[in-house]
């Protein structure tokens, strides 16, 4: 996937230029699949496939999400809505959960305006390469960087796990989020 294509897609969807492009990797796991949430040992690594996001700030409080991998419309909600509801477009809940939980932090008031976000993955959904964790870590990284949040990578990983467990309602350990957020080239996590 190339940056120019992503920026072009963003422009076509939102009618304006995107500001920044982000990437969050997926992960493989050599041993220990389905054992991390039972306290077992795992051996994951980040990979070169993942989820890309093009961010653009807004002057209002609307968050507008669009996935290049799912047929459908723009998902839109207001940051000022105290109870962000789960969406019937399941993929959007990973973004909504991270936004909700980061806004609840002490410095969450820094997330003080809306944004447009175009996402596209080269990870096959349901392939076991942690597309959901990559989405969560992408959203966390974007909010951290664009709103100057004081949150470290392990805390973002835990926020992603909380999103998956509590907001989305899936049972997961912390392995996927840690591998996607802390992993880097040529290093096993």
Region locations from a protein language model:
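Conserved small/polar residues in nucleotide/adenosyl-binding loops
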Residues: 185-189
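ATP-binding N-lobe of GHMP and related small-molecule kinases
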Residues: 1-129, 133, 140-153, 158-168, ...
């Amino acid at each position: 996937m190339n940056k120019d294509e992503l920026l072009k897609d963003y422009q076509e969807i939102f009618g304006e230029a995107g500001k920044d492009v982000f990437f969050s990797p997926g992960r493989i796991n050599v041993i220990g699949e389905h054992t991390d949430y039972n306290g077992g040992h795992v051996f994951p690594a980040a990979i070169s496939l993942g989820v890309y996001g093009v961010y653009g700030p807004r002057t209002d409080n609307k968050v507008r999400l669009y996935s290049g991998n799912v047929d459908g419309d723009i998902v839109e909600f207001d940051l000022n809505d105290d109870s962000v509801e789960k969406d019937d477009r399941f993929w959007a809940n990973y973004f909504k959960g991270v936004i909700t939980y980061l806004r609840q932090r002490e410095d969450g008031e820094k997330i003080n305006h809306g944004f447009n976000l175009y996402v596209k993955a080269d990870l096959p959904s349901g392939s076991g390469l942690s597309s959901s964790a990559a989405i969560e870590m992408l959203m966390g990284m974007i909010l951290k960087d664009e709103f100057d949040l004081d949150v470290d990578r392990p805390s973002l990983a835990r926020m992603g796990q909380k999103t998956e467990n509590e907001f989305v309602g899936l049972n997961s350990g912390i392995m996927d989020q840690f591998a996607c957020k802390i992993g880097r080239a040529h290093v096993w996590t």
